[in-house]
Amino acid sequence: MTTVYTLVSWLAILGYWLLIAGVTLRILMKRRAVPSAMAWLLIIYILPLVGIIAYLAVGELHLGKRRAERARAMWPSTAKWLNDLKACKHIFAEENSSVAAPLFKLCERRQGIAGVKGNQLQLMTESDDVMQALIRDIQLARHNIEMVFYIWKPGGMADQVAESLMAAARRGIHCRLMLDSAGSVAFFRSPWPELMRNAGIEVVEALKVNLMRVFLRRMDLRQHRKMIMIDNYIAYTGSMNMVDPRYFKQDAGVGQWIDLMARMEGPIATAMGIIYSCDWEIETGKRILPPPPDVNIMPFEQASGHTIHTIASGPGFPEDLIHQALLTAAYSAREYLIMTTPYFVPSDDLFHAICTAAQRGVDVSIILPRKNDSMLVGWASRAFFTELLAAGVKIYQFEGGLLHTKSVLVDGELSLVGTVNLDMRSLWLNFEITLAIDDKGFGADLAAVQDDYISRSRLLDARLWLKRPLWQRVAERLFYFFSPLL
């Protein structure tokens, strides 16, 4: 009996070390950033079983077998659609401003199409204005309405949008709604999904959370896009979820969420439509390629102004493109660079690009919320402040609520707005969308919004920052070490 017990013990020990060695080898063989690999190895060696389970669950990008197969199957038809779109030469810009040209060339080379011209844009900063405009557009819709959101929280004006969407479906408009399973958990536990389906709306719960499949698909891979397309002509995107901020996270202690949305009219809606069709096919297996833009789709003067490139990320989309776009924007800056984000845990490359811009004389400002709804990200963000301040970057801490806007403005001409936070999750993991806009007029509008944010912010004093307590510095460095995993 003793011999059997000893043998079992040795086999258990051997299996334990083989498991650690196998996971270690898997981490080392994956092409990933060194800080990320080191952080995972530290967790595994300090807390082996917890670390191994965590790595197998969220350490690698698993879309899931079925969705991965759909992603591979959709690309031949999507590539053909994009190639056919090139025949619509009237919608593509032939040149860009000097500051935007490198980024637009990058997007064209990697996505296969040039920037789309002939669009009319409107920046919207008040949730009531966004929802009222959306309700009007829904009421005037003639053919189709397609939406995707990370969060849909019932209550307030969000319910009015839901009612108008159901009314549209009842009068024959083809309505599709895709919502992230984790972000919209309150919605899917409410009566609204059944009400909408009964009205004729196709409602899809994207990336369902299922703990039984935790090792088969990465559970923290989320559908983070916020997009609306109406009649393949009107489109919305930005940082705002389908929530009324007066009813959303009121007990979080961070104030109301402050967002920015762009409402667009023009052929850019078609470019956004192909992104939506890819998401829909990955999730449902159904192909819904949008029609090409009509030759008469551009009523705006000379079909000029507001040239836009859509940049999408996520499994199945061009890898690392949003990260490359942000790097290109930072290195293209000559006069000033203003970045707004609720979560600031950048990659080493992006962090150095920001510091380098400031060190070569560019006026660099970063606007962050003073209070954050994520304690981990909040502490990790502060670990970057000392080097940013030393490089000459201005850090503004917004005090008027949780600033949720994601925006970048370069030299007043190149603007980036969308759903992408400056953190690892947005840069490398989630389904995201960003608009790159080459237009001085839009840049002026965005600058006015950012100036308003700055007027409601406090500039971080470098001298006071260096005098913060030792325990805060220790906490910052601790969370910074794990920042590659956040």
UniProtKB/Swiss-Prot annotation:
PANTHER family named in the record: CARDIOLIPIN SYNTHASE (PTHR21248), PHOSPHOLIPASE D (PTHR21248:SF22)
How the protein sits in the membrane? Answer: Multi-pass membrane protein
Q: What is this protein called?
A: Cardiolipin synthase A
Residues in PLD phosphodiesterase domain copies: 219-246, 399-426
Principal location class: membrane
| GO (cellular component) term, any one | plasma membrane
| InterPro entries linked | Cardiolipin_synthase, CL_synthase_A, CLS_N, PLD-like_dom, PLipase_D/transphosphatidylase
Repeat listed as a keyword: yes
Record gene name = clsA
The transmembrane segments are: 3-23, 38-58
